[in-house]
Swiss-Prot record:
It catalyses: an N-(acyl)-sphingosylphosphocholine = an N-(acyl)-sphingosyl-1,3-cyclic phosphate + choline; an N-(acyl)-sphingosylphosphoethanolamine = an N-(acyl)-sphingosyl-1,3-cyclic phosphate + ethanolamine; a 1-acyl-sn-glycero-3-phosphocholine = a 1-acyl-sn-glycero-2,3-cyclic phosphate + choline; a 1-acyl-sn-glycero-3-phosphoethanolamine = a 1-acyl-sn-glycero-2,3-cyclic phosphate + ethanolamine. It is an enzyme of class 4 (lyase). One of its GO terms (cellular component) is extracellular region. This is Dermonecrotic toxin LgSicTox-alphaI-1. It comes from Loxosceles gaucho (Spider). Expressed by the venom gland. GO terms for molecular function: lyase activity; metal ion binding; phosphoric diester hydrolase activity; toxin activity. Dermonecrotic toxins cleave the phosphodiester linkage between the phosphate and headgroup of certain phospholipids (sphingolipid and lysolipid substrates), forming an alcohol (often choline) and a cyclic phosphate. This toxin acts on sphingomyelin (SM). It may also act on ceramide phosphoethanolamine (CPE), lysophosphatidylcholine (LPC) and lysophosphatidylethanolamine (LPE), but not on lysophosphatidylserine (LPS), and lysophosphatidylglycerol (LPG). It acts by transphosphatidylation, releasing exclusively cyclic phosphate products as second products. Mg(2+) binds at residues 32, 34. Belongs to the arthropod phospholipase D family. Class II subfamily. Binds 1 Mg(2+) ion per subunit. Disulfide bonds: none annotated. InterPro entries: PLC-like_Pdiesterase_TIM-brl.
Length: 40
């Protein structure tokens, strides 16, 4: 049986559209999103 698993390329601290485009160009499969919560 073939027990190989895929390798995922993760991008950490991707905080702008420019960075997302850059990382995708480098082979990014998924990215970490940093969310900010504000009190009103």
């Amino acid at each position: 049986a073939d027990n190989k698993r895929p390798i995922w390329v993760m991008g950490g601290m991707v905080n702008s559209l420019a960075q997302i485009k850059e990382f995708v160009g480098l082979g990014l499969d998924n990215s970490e999103k940093d969310n900010k919560w504000y009190k009103q």
